[in-house]
């Protein structure tokens, strides 16, 4: 039992961060304090503030503290520890992906493209956008308005004539001399830049002026082209949600909470336009206040420098924050400019907040319905398998083309649905081509023939295949020499029905020794189909990547003197593998680092 009295006797009154551990030495909670002694003493009073705190304190086996120079530094360290340890009593943000941007490169002929990750490429970044689909829609729109190239440099540098995008009026073809001057191309780039900055009116004014100039010069064809461009820009402006009040770049956060599920809705506003919205469903311990949830979410969401996450000038929230000043100070340091957190809104901003609230509530209702349905499906599966509780399920599938580039996939589900962080793919080697039984055995050995933590041991393992596959899986498990309980998993074969139609699957239960044909509307069957389809898709996508990689490397890997660096140079300068295969001997020899003799070897190898 944790000796709180002796521990507190040695705690200082400094600012800092504390980490609480359970008896397994797992971090279960991370917190920060202006006064460590005062804050930690509050956990061991006779009357605690909530049931959440009572449960936390009862699980404490030891506590570590880290003294910091300021409360702001403690706040940053707290969020770093939460991200590292993922403690179960902290609010945890599950979605930690970086956001997509639109990149306008700094080149002679700038390229416009989608971009995600740290901002390493020189150019201007516009965003962030809430989803990749929002970026794709914007890029498609920009192509219709401004004829700027979107092709990769490997393609751009190796064109001898304009591509289809030029033919349909969506690119000015700067890749080929004589089609557009640098000045004319850069004018279109500037218009696209203004448009992305939200300066639509400036774009219109510029185009109108150019149209008038063309008319005065009696260049009616050019005037008509610009007129069509003006009409396209106006049509877009009419559809866009633009604020009448000039607004900073800002994010608006609203939280809806019901039945243990929280939804944080984020609206992204840049240059007065709403770029879109996104819903988050953080893991929230019981009895967490919405104010605490808001503060934790803001910290975890924006203090992700490695994710290239953008911090706006203003963050609007719908709950009062006790540590607003510290968060503002920390975000200001991170952004390198003043960042405001606003918890009381008026005017146009309050309308946006209402919109965020409506979206949060709507998304939460949908999530609750999905959560309820998933729970019902789990209960139905537990009933047919006669299991008390299913905490973790895994499913295996094999994918190959005529026995080549074989990939095995393993997907994982828990009671919240897919656990994608635990998904795995296995390269299958050293087997007879097309031997799915041997492939399954190799995948199972790679997955399970090693030490496993208790929570990583699946209760159910689905094998995509009939009796033969299941029997091979059972034989493989019988040979495992491991310390964990290899009899815990219930292995189930999922045989495809007649004509491989969904709803006609046969379930082969290894422990009960029986075969089940569930009706097509059975909730348990729906869950199994979901898991199996996810595994199948995961295997196919991995196989396609492997096949594509093999295609790109085929013919070059076997050439003596062509390593990874030269291979990449060839692909870059000649426009991909197809370009290399079509290239003449002289074209291959013109690539930097490729001698005449090496070019001959490459040329001959690709024609054997």
Curated annotation (Swiss-Prot):
Start and end residues of each UVR domain: 201-236
Keyword DNA repair in record: yes
Domain named GIY-YIG: residues: 13-91
Database matches in PROSITE patterns: GIY_YIG, UVR, UVRC
Gene3D superfamilies: 5' to 3' exonuclease, C-terminal subdomain, GIY-YIG endonuclease, UVR domain, UvrC, RNAse H endonuclease domain
GO CC, any one term: cytoplasm
SUPFAM superfamilies reported for this sequence: C-terminal UvrC-binding domain of UvrB, GIY-YIG endonuclease, RuvA domain 2-like
Protein purpose: The UvrABC repair system catalyzes the recognition and processing of DNA lesions. UvrC both incises the 5' and 3' sides of the lesion. The N-terminal half is responsible for the 3' incision and the C-terminal half is responsible for the 5' incision.
Family, similarity comment: Belongs to the UvrC family.
Database matches in NCBIfam families: PRK00558.1-5, uvrC
Name used for this protein in its record: UvrABC system protein C
């Amino acid at each position: 039992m944790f000796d709180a009295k002796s521990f507190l006797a040695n705690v200082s009154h400094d600012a800092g961060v504390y980490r609480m551990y359970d008896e397994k030495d797992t971090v279960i909670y991370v917190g920060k304090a202006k006064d460590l002694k005062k804050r930690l003493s509050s956990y061991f009073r006779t009357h605690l503030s909530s049931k959440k705190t009572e449960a936390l304190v009862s699980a404490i086996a030891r506590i570590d503290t880290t003294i910091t120079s300021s409360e702001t530094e403690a706040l940053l360290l707290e969020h770093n520890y939460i991200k590292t340890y993922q403690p179960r009593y902290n609010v945890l943000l599950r979605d930690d992906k970086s956001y997509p941007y639109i990149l306008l490169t700094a080149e002679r002929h700038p390229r416009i493209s989608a971009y995600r990750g740290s901002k390493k490429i020189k150019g201007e970044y516009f965003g962030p956008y809430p989803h990749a689909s929002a970026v794709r829609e914007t890029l498609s729109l920009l192509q219709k308005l401004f004829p700027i190239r979107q092709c990769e440099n490997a393609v751009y540098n190796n064109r001898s004539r304009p591509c289809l995008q030029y033919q349909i009026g969506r690119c000015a073809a700067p890749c080929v001399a004589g089609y557009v001057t640098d000045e004319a191309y850069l004018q279109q780039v500037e218009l696209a830049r203004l448009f992305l900055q939200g300066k639509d009116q400036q774009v219109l004014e510029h185009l109108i002026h150019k149209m008038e100039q063309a008319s005065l010069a009696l260049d009616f064809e050019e005037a008509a082209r610009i007129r069509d461009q003006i009409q396209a820009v106006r049509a877009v402006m009419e559809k866009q949600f633009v604020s009448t009040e000039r607004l900073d770049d800002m994010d608006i956060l609203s939280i809806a909470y019901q039945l243990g599920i929280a939804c944080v809705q984020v609206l992204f506003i840049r240059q007065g336009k709403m770029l879109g919205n996104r819903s988050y469903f953080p893991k929230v311990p019981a009895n967490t206040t919405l104010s605490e949830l808001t503060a934790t979410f803001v910290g975890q969401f924006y203090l992700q420098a490695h994710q290239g996450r953008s911090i706006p000038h203003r963050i609007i929230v719908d709950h009062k924050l006790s540590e607003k000043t510290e968060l503002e100070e920390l975000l200001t340091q991170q952004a390198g400019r003043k960042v405001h957190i606003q918890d009381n809104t008026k005017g146009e901003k309050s309308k946006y907040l209402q919109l965020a609230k409506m979206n949060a509530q709507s998304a939460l209702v949908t999530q609750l319905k999905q959560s309820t349905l998933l729970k019902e499906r789990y209960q139905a599966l537990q009933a047919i398998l006669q299991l008390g509780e299913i905490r973790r399920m895994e499913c295996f599938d094999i994918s190959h083309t005529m026995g080549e580039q074989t990939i095995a996939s393993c997907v994982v589900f828990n009671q919240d649905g897919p656990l994608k962080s635990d998904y795995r793919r296995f390269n299958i080697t050293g087997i007879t081509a097309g031997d799915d039984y041997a492939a399954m055995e190799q995948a199972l050995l790679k997955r399970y023939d090693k030490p496993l933590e208790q929570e990583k041991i699946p209760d159910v393992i689905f094998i995509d295949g009939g009796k033969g596959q299941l029997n091979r899986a059972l034989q493989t498990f019988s040979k495992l020499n491991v310390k964990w309980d290899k009899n815990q998993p219930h292995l189930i074969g999922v045989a495809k029905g007649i004509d491989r139609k969904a709803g006609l699957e046969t379930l082969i239960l290894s422990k009960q020794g029986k075969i089940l044909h569930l009706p097509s509307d059975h909730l348990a069957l729906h869950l199994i189909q979901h898991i199996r389809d996810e595994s199948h898709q995961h295997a196919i996508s991995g196989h396609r990547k492997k096949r594509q990689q093999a295609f790109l490397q085929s013919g070059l890997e076997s050439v003596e003197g062509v390593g990874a660096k030269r291979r990449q140079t060839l692909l870059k300068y000649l426009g991909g593998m197809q370009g290399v295969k079509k290239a003449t001997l002289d074209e291959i020899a013109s690539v930097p680092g490729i001698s005449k003799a090496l070019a001959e070897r490459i040329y001959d190898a690709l024609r054997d």
